[in-house]
Amino acid sequence: MIPAPGAGSEGTKKKRKRRRPANRAPQTSTSGMTPTPSKKPARPYAKRVDEVSAGGLVIDKSGLQGLLIGRRDQKDPEGKKLLWSLPKGHIEEGETPEQAAIREVAEETGINSQITQSLGVIDFWFMAGGKRIHKTVHHFIFKETGGLLAAQESEVDEVGWFPLAEIVGLLAYPDEKKLIAKNAELLA
């Protein structure tokens, strides 16, 4: 005998039990009960700090060499390795990025210069002292106008002139490497 439609199990759906994610505890009724606090204390967000700096690449009077600053690598156990970078520093209140760049180059290297053109802007994030730092650095190309090469003792370990063709290979920071490589035609 053939069952009539709807008379048997055909056409009826079985109710599925809803699965909960493995990392979730079963829900229980808490009516009349106070919820128990989490065992882990909430982790506070790191404070965000915005910093704006300016600097760049100074080209010597011959047009063949660029100026870099070297700082000791804090991760080097022997303390001998230098991290080479472009001279730069914070923009002070009332300064334009151009004014700050010229001042910072002179302070860190002893070299006076004038800006010939913009090189670009680097924007990045890092953690320091428990704070999230958002840093924007305005970079320029400079022409040397005078001064005597001398490292600023409080911030820089060494300064030096290097052939322009070697600058990208010497730079320690990938963002600066990319910026110079992208603008290589401006250095010729």
Where are these regions (language model features)?
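C-terminal alpha-helix
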Residues: 182-187
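Short, charged/polar surface micro-motifs in flexible loops or helix N-caps
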Residues: 62-65, 74-75, 92, 121, ...
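A generic structural micro-feature
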Residues: 48-50, 83, 116, 131-136, ...
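N-terminal strand-loop-strand
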Residues: 12-15, 21-86
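N-terminal acidic, proline/glycine-rich, low-complexity intrinsically disordered segments
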Residues: 1-15
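The catalytic Nudix box helix
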Residues: 86-119
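NUDIX/MutT-family hydrolases
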Residues: 139, 143, 148-181
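Active-site segment of metal-dependent pyrophosphate-handling enzymes
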Residues: 110-147
